[in-house]
Amino acid sequence: MLDDDLPVWVPIPALAEIQIALETAVANVTELEGFELKRIMRTGTVATIDNRNWELREHSGPVQRLSQSRAIALDMESATIAANGFRFRVPYGTLLCVSDKPLHGELKLPGMASDFYKTQVASHLRIGIQAMEILREMPLERIHSRKLRSFEETAFL
């Protein structure tokens, strides 16, 4: 639906300002730092795909493209948030709670995921709220990223 505004071949960059706020919030909530923090958290670009059942079919093509893109995860909803944030020049970011690894033969089934969600949802909510509080305290000019500007737009305000 957004292909005219943002073709599928256009990468949507991760915004460092948002990632730093999320990483700070994760460190505060989990009380981890250094390698221990990096062990549980990855930051970067999240890719998407237009086929919800891609992992159930032959997927060597999508896997190769995703690997070459250096994406750290695949998520349809995060892509929608990023695409619209990018399109409307609104800072964007998502905090994903990874509960399945389809490429490793670990599909998320309803019963298998319930324990994971019980333990993770509350901490992710605290992390999200704290990240928004960190961002709220930042001056607007710091939150606004140059990555939200296109090639034809002036690089500086």
Can you name each region flagged by the protein language model?
Residues 1-157:
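Accessory terminal and edge-of-domain segments that mediate assembly/interaction
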